[in-house]
Amino acid sequence: MIKENFIKLYENSFKENWDLPCYTDYGEDTTFTYGQVAEEIAKIHLLFQYCSLRRGDKISIIGKNTSRWCIAYLATVTYGAIVVPILQDFKPNDVHHIVNHSESTFLFTSDNIWENLEEEALSGLRAVFSLTDFRCLHQRDGETVQKFMKNMDEAMKKNFPKGFYKENINYTELSNEKVMLLNYTSGTTGFSKGVMITGNNLAGNVTFGIRTELLKKGEKVLSFLPLAHAYGCAFDFLTATAVGTHVTLLGKTPSPKILMKAFEEVKPNLIITVPLVIEKIYKNVIQPLINKRSMKWALNIPLLDNQIYAQIRKKLIDALGGRFKEVIIGGAAMNPEVTDFFHKIKFPFTIGYGMTECAPLISYAPWNEFIPGSAGKILDIMKVRIDSDDPYNITGEIQVCGENVMKGYYKNEEATREVFTEDGWLKTGDLGTIDANGFIYIRGRSKTMILSSNGQNIFPEEIESKLNNMPFVLESLIIERNKKLVALVYPDYESLDSLGLNTPENLKTVMDENLKNLNKLVGNYEQVSKIQLYPTEFEKTPKKSIKRFLYNSITEE
């Protein structure tokens, strides 16, 4: 058990960093100090008390990265309720499912997202609040939440007649063993799994960040990864807030142009990112330089190449704000070309490894200790083993145990049993090896999950289940080709024949329409690039499961 209490980390931080800047929404003038964040949390606690919210009740949050997203999260966990973050690009039906499956009482959401949700599909909610200003967007019949919110100033004066000061912060010290977070691994109805994360799991990640001094008091960080994603949440937000860092929240799509401008203005001391983002920056900032004829010539001259690499390194560091200690990349495999070039120019980057079920960190090494090809070193609060006769040389499933490992999947005992070994180790589903020093080398992924370039988990069966319900699709199989999803489809030729539609032109029209409709039903990171027709039924196991490994290398038509 981690000795530091997760809730007390934030009580202490608010008191110690009272006047320091805490959260700023990028592009806006308003900044919340740590003291102001604590006061906003106190207001939400009064709301919860007024509504007789119980410890252990669930509260969902969905929206872009904003100060109030962070405040709603911290208000929930410091009250003793369980927070349920939802990725903002999930489809409405998936949001409905998660809110209902988690049995959420309240929902904090962006106004535009709320407009696309259906009230009747969320009948279990007592109230919905805006992440713009915390006003009540909806209340269930018989509730008086809106009236209370309008009189919040009076409630604060009544409870804090002398004003709200750091001495008023006194959160109940909830046991680290308590579940504080439900993080859903997927948004699709029927397949989503709510990962039960305890205070101990969260404290394990945050205190690791504190011990290794990833961030310090008074430093700056730019939060652009989705806060509903375990990686960005743990370090850009939770660790940063625990140590007194100033967090600027980028509530926009992190295109290279927007990021470059934000990095220049914020000048972060640490950058947490995924391969897709850093590869785009490489493509936009570095490739135009090194592809010049004069540059290619110069890089082939001994001694001169080192000088040029140093200049390129400086240009890249300056483009990212110029003040960061290192760039930590996680969530997916890096493009080898980019990795090799970064090593050549001695760029301060490292690659970590984790998963939602570990909240998320499993392995990490600072950039000056990082071994190329590895995914970092197993944390000192975790253990790793490889399900292999020779874990140093023969690939096997990576299995872990330790402080960061989840309690299980919410209301899904079967999935929980399947993901743990009989002796209690978490089966990551990743294949790899380790070395004598505890560095992990990931060789691939087991089963069927595909990891998108921005770190999102893609479950092919979920997309296939939607596609298989579309006109004239008998079977389908989602594969990855050149980092894009392709759907192999065996058409229902019998039905096409019976309707006199079995011509290449008609089949193309039908499948084009299916592709268009399919991409409306899945998340942005699950978009299918094309449908490729397959001439026969797919080969199956005795259990009638498709033998996926036979089709992963199917080439383009």
Positions of predicted regions on the chain:
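Conserved AMP-binding/adenylate-forming core of the ANL superfamily
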Residues: 22-66, 70, 74, 91-96, ...
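Conserved AMP-binding/adenylation subdomain of ANL enzymes
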Residues: 203-220, 227-314, 323, 348
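Conserved C-terminal "lid"/linker of ANL adenylate-forming enzymes
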Residues: 450, 475-486, 513-557
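Conserved AMP-binding A3 loop
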Residues: 33-35, 171, 180-206
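Conserved pre-ATP/AMP-binding loop-to-beta segment of ANL
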Residues: 18-19, 149-184, 191, 214-220
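Conserved ATP-binding/catalytic segment of the ANL
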Residues: 385, 392-452
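AMP-dependent adenylate-forming
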Residues: 9-33, 530
